[in-house]
C-alpha cells in the first residue's frame, strides 16, 4: 500500500502504503483501499493484535462522531495529529489551528446533529504503524432556524500511531447529497401508557424544539 497525496503536503511515500491520490475521485480512493491486501498475522498473538489495532482505528471515527455531535470541539481535535491536513468541499486546511476553525464553524451551524458511519474499511502498512480508513457517512441535523436536513458523503483517513494512539494525519471528506426531513410530531403517541415520571429523553437533549 503506497500513500501519494498529489499536490497536498508531500508526505513521504512508502512501498507498503495504499497508492492513493487525495485529490483524485472518491472512488479511486475507496477502491484503492478495498483492493489493498488485508494484513494478517501468522500467529494467534499477531492475529489478535491486528484485531485490536483495527478496532482502535475504527474507534477514532466513532469518537470523532460523538465529539462532533456533542459540540465538543476539543474532543474533535483530539483525534487529529498536530501535523494534520483536511480536504473538504470548501478547500484544504493545513495544521490544527486551521482545522479547528473549520470545525468551530461547522459545529455552530446546527442545534443538534447525529452522524452515522457505515461501510468502514481499514488497511494497515506492514508494520501496523500507519493505516488507511474509508467510510460512508450519513448525517442528520437541525439548523438554528429549525430546518431538518440530512447529508451524505465519504471519509478517507490516513492515520499514524503516536505513543500508542491512532491520530488522523490526513483526511478527505466528500459531500455528495443533501435533502430535507419532516419533523417528528410533538407530544406522546395516542394510546401510549402514562410514564412514571415526566422527565423524558427530550429533557436530556434540550427543550425538544430541536426535534
Label the predicted regions:
Residues 3-5, 13, 21:
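Acidic, Ala/Val/Gly-enriched low-complexity intrinsically disordered segments
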Residues 17-74, 78:
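Short, low-complexity N-terminal intrinsically disordered segments enriched in polar/charged residues
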Residues 68, 80, 137-139, 172-175:
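Short beta-strand segments enriched in hydrophobic/aromatic residues
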Residues 73-141:
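A solvent-exposed, acidic/Ser-Thr-rich amphipathic alpha-helical stretch
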Residues 115-117, 150-155:
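Short, surface-exposed coil-to-beta transition loops
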Residues 139-148, 179:
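Short, cysteine-centered beta-strand-loop-beta hairpins and adjacent loop/turn segments enriched
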Amino acid at each position: 500500500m503506497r500513500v501519494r497525496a498529489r499536490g497536498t503536503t508531500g508526505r513521504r511515500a512508502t512501498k507498503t502504503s495504499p497508492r492513493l491520490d487525495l485529490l483524485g475521485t472518491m472512488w479511486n480512493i475507496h477502491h484503492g483501499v478495498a483492493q489493498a491486501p488485508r494484513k494478517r498475522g501468522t500467529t494467534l498473538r499477531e492475529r489478535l493484535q491486528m484485531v485490536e489495532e483495527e478496532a482502535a482505528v475504527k474507534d477514532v471515527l466513532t469518537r470523532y462522531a460523538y465529539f462532533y455531535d456533542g459540540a465538543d470541539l476539543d474532543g474533535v481535535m483530539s483525534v487529529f495529529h498536530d501535523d494534520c491536513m483536511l480536504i473538504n468541499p470548501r478547500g484544504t486546511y493545513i495544521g490544527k489551528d486551521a482545522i479547528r476553525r473549520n470545525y468551530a464553524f461547522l459545529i455552530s451551524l446546527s442545534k443538534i446533529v447525529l452522524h452515522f458511519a457505515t461501510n468502514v474499511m481499514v488497511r494497515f502498512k506492514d508494520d501496523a504503524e500507519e493505516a488507511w480508513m474509508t467510510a460512508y457517512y450519513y448525517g442528520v441535523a437541525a439548523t438554528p432556524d429549525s430546518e431538518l436536513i440530512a447529508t451524505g458523503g465519504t471519509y478517507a483517513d490516513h492515520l499514524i500511531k503516536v505513543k500508542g494512539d491512532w491520530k488522523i494525519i490526513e483526511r478527505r471528506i466528500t459531500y455528495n447529497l443533501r435533502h430535507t426531513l419532516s419533523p417528528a410530531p410533538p407530544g406522546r403517541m395516542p394510546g401510549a401508557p402514562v410514564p412514571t415520571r415526566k422527565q423524558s429523553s427530550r429533557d436530556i437533549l434540550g427543550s425538544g424544539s430541536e426535534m
